[in-house]
């Protein structure tokens, strides 16, 4: 396991890694997080590396200092020859809804359960310890939007385990249902509309895939 502390200065950036393995499809894990604030992961992904490959993790948001941990599955041999901080030219949205989603996603790990609002944002986030079904069981979804009221319920217990990009795509998906879609009930349309904004903001595609895969499980 290798650890690094990178001065990202709260600016958009990308972190580039050059990784070499002796074997084929060696699973290598890369995690970046805020060492000061709890439950604040900026990225967390697994890559299957063969030979020498470059991996770049995009961070439209970053902490003052980013702690990075890299390791391989089963302690298989690998070499990390470069960790480089790069500028990230991504869209910085001034749209209140998107700014609210990004800020909440960044701070969710340390926020208490409660109601959260923002100026010029047409909905409230109800941050709950857990979301329950009508029968009182733990709901599998990390967030859901009310079909009639401007409320998005978010599970703190599930958001605490998610990366910031995963939180962003989940919230954008829910926002799309009521405020972007032509068909409010269409999951496919919400996926498309949420991903369109997410990609414009510059977040890693692999984190969106991870978020949807976790929900499907």
Where are these regions (language model features)?
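Auxiliary, metal-adjacent structural segments of Zn-dependent hydrolase domains
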Residues: 34, 89-147
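Active-site scaffold of zinc-dependent metalloenzymes
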Residues: 126-164, 175-181
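Active-site recognition of the HExxH zinc-binding catalytic motif
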Residues: 169-181, 190-191
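C-terminal edge strands of extracellular/lumenal beta-sandwich accessory domains
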Residues: 73-92
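Short, surface-exposed beta-strand/strand-loop-strand elements in extracellular ectodomains
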Residues: 24-45, 79-85
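Long, well-structured alpha-helical subdomains associated
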Residues: 201-217
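An active-site-proximal "capping" alpha-helix that borders the catalytic cofactor pocket
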Residues: 185-201
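Noncatalytic modules at the cell exterior or secretory-pathway interfaces
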Residues: 11-19, 53-75
């Amino acid at each position: 396991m290798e650890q690094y502390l990178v001065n990202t200065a709260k600016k958009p950036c990308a972190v580039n890694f050059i990784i070499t393995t002796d074997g084929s499809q060696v699973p290598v894990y890369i995690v970046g997080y805020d060492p000061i604030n709890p439950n604040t992961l900026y990225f967390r992904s697994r890559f299957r590396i063969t030979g020498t490959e470059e991996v770049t993790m995009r961070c439209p948001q970053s902490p003052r200092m980013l702690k990075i941990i890299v390791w391989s599955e089963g302690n298989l041999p690998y070499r990390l020859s470069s960790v480089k901080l790069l500028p990230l030219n991504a869209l910085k949205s001034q749209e209140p809804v998107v700014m609210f989603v990004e800020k909440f996603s960044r701070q969710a790990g340390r926020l208490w359960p409660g109601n959260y609002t923002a100026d010029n944002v047409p909905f409230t986030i109800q941050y709950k310890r857990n979301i329950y079904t009508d029968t009182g069981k733990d709901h599998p979804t990390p967030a859901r939007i009310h079909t009639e009221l401007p409320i998005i319920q978010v599970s703190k217990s599930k958001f605490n385990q998610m990366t910031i990009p995963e939180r962003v795509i989940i919230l954008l998906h829910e926002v799309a249902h009521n405020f972007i879609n032509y068909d409010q009930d269409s999951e496919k349309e919400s996926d498309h509309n949420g991903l369109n904004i997410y990609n414009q903001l510059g977040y890693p595609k692999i984190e969106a895939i991870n978020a949807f895969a976790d929900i499907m499980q």
